[in-house]
């Protein structure tokens, strides 16, 4: 009987949705969206990040003033309790993803370990 990895991936997706880490992100993001100032800061910072990524992908240099603006945004975000809670929740979920990834690639690691 052949194993369908996609069935397992779909089960993993459902398990992630039921996890405490996912629920924490969902709640934290709802709190960010519910607070006008938090939402504005969050959206501005995301836009800055996207612009930086696009410039890096195109090989463009990021201007000093853009870096300064990003640093100021990052400082404002650190002071925002809603966004800080969201970032903490995201870090916890990222740790879960890293651990899951280690489990997933273990068979390949074993092949190349010899």
Swiss-Prot record:
This is UPF0342 protein SAOUHSC_01977. Belongs to the UPF0342 family. InterPro entries: Com_YlbF (IPR010368), YheA/YmcA-like_dom_sf (IPR023378). Pfam families: Com_YlbF. SUPFAM superfamilies: YheA/YmcA-like. It comes from the Bacteria. It comes from Staphylococcus aureus (strain NCTC 8325 / PS 47).
């Amino acid at each position: 009987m052949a194993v369908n990895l996609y069935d397992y991936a779909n089960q993993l997706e459902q398990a992630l949705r039921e996890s405490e880490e996912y629920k924490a992100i969902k709640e934290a993001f709802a709190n960010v969206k519910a607070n006008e100032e938090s939402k504005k800061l969050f959206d501005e910072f995301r836009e800055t990040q996207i612009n930086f990524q696009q410039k890096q992908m195109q090989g463009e240099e990021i201007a000093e003033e853009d870096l300064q603006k990003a640093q100021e945004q990052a400082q404002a975000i650190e002071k925002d309790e809603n966004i800080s809670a969201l970032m903490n929740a995201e870090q916890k979920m990222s740790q879960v993803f890293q651990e899951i990834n280690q489990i997933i690639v273990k068979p390949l690691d074993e092949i190349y370990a010899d």
